[in-house]
């Protein structure tokens, strides 16, 4: 059996830009997952004064506006993963010039970007332990870069851990 690849095109419309459709029968709402807030993490978010927006479907820190963007809580499988993601982005937030002034600016996939991600992952892990959060650490896409850097520079992990520790201390001690 021989396979022949074919290219098909489809016309796609953004449902929010259409009029006159009755979608109540077509789209069923997503089931709401129970969300148990973690008061210690919520208090940390408030205490930092970080501007945290819960919209969209991606998590990131936006240096230009000094804002953290998180997907809405109901999009996470559980509260712990929401908070782990928020803590990761909060560590990025500490790197702003007005705070700990960590160098950033690398593009996705660059060594400097991967280094900042390692700082954020380690800092997040430190915070999760202190705050009693048990969630998943997201680092699969950076492992190759980290391994290469670890082979090239034996101090790499210590430099990242030091920066993560400073971020942890900055956040926990206010």
Task: Give the predicted meaning of each segment.
Residues 1-174:
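N-terminal accessory/interface modules of nucleic-acid-binding and processing proteins
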């Amino acid at each position: 059996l021989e396979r022949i690849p074919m290219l098909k095109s489809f016309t796609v419309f953004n449902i929010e830009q259409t009029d006159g459709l009755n979608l109540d029968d077509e789209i069923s709402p997503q089931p709401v997952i129970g969300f148990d807030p973690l008061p210690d993490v919520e208090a940390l978010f408030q205490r930092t004064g970080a501007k945290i927006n819960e919209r969209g479907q991606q998590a990131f820190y936006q240096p230009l506006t000094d804002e953290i963007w998180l997907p809405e809580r109901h999009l996470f499988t559980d509260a712990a993963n929401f908070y782990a993601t928020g803590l990761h982005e909060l560590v990025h937030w500490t790197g702003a010039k007005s705070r700990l002034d960590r160098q950033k600016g690398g593009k996705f996939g660059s060594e400097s970007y991967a280094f900042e991600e390692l700082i954020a992952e380690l800092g997040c892990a430190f915070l999760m332990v202190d705050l009693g959060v048990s969630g998943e650490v997201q680092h699969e896409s950076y492992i190759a870069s980290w391994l290469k850097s670890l082979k090239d520079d034996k101090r790499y992990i210590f430099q990242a851990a030091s920066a993560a520790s400073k971020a942890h201390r900055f956040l926990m001690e206010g």
